[in-house]
Amino acid sequence: MKIKPFKGVRPPKEYVEQVQSRPYDVLNSAEVRAEAEGNEKSLYHIIKPEIDFPEGTDEHDPKVYEKAAQNFQMFQDKGWLVQDGKERYYIYAQTMNGKTQYGLVVCAYVDDYMTGKIKKHELTRRDKEEDRMKHVRVNNANIEPVFFAYPDNKDVDAIVAKYTKGTPEYDYTAELDGFRHTFWIIDDDADIQRITELFAAMPAMYIADGHHRSAAAALVGAEKAKQNPNHRGDEEYNFFMAVCFPANQLTIIDYNRVVKDLNGLSDEEFLKKLSDDFIVEKKGAEIFKPSRLHEFSLYLGGNWYSLVAKPGTYNDNDPIGVLDVTISSNLILDKILGIKDLRSDKRIDFVGGIRGLGELKKRVDSGEMKVALALYPVSMKQLIDIADTGNIMPPKTTWFEPKLRSGLVIHKLS
């Protein structure tokens, strides 16, 4: 894998907590307005610039993208973002519930994405790619990083451990979620060279989160190469910013489903149909969480049920067919509830496990939804197997937590 250090554009220590933000795609415009209110230094003015226009302004209006570029320049003019004078790697650690994961902030190579060395597990939507491409073009920068996993490597771990014993550049706990974010600078030339060499020996990296940002960064890089008659291949636009974590440190949490109706069935008829493919056991009113693969938790009519897929209902040798999202999509959502397309069907919604199973109960008890289905989370091993075999995960399969904060460091393309 080809990586390189870069001259990060980042906030001085005293501004980092005001500048940093959550990623662009986890909040809607109204939520961002509320979160950025009264904070002129918030990165949201660059990644969600529609908040600087009257409510109801189309976030895809050309003037909104233009505003992002103006704000990015203004942040630099005012000294809220300052470019490092030297190419460096950085370390970004996140601590959630007492567990810490350590990521290396690097520039990944556009060609590695184009040739499939940077492996995907999700399909991207062209409209979302185009939105991010406009954002990269207008700012001439990767404002937000993507989230990669790499094969565990003790030599990389040792270099990271050496720096994380030292004083961090940033260290704060985010008010909203209580997660701790810590950031160190690697500026020793020998360590920088060693990290580059260690990654060069790796056969692959995996996109954990940020498929649209990765696609956009790579496509803009390829576009700039075409437009440059003197293209050499080592220009800054040939690279895009990623935070790379060892796969063994990452946790995927459950990504659950809620459905509006039972497709014309009564509760009893629905449960009877489920028993064709699942061993169904009523658990009662207390929240029940699945504890292993092929076990599901169902909430219906004030009761929780355990569902265990019967042998023969899935194929252990099929990396996609063996996934619980596939089993539940085929045997429950499609076969019984008539939901064919998870991306477009308005009867279904998805709830990240970070909200807890109480959120599923709440949405059913309120009458908004009729039934909830909780899944056992996908493992990193399953994700890597799927990416390695060139397969694609079904939609809404993986939820990584904690999410990367944006605004700790930015990569300029020239």
Question: Predicted segment positions?
Answer:
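Surface-exposed, charge/polar-rich loops and edge strands
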Residues: 1-414
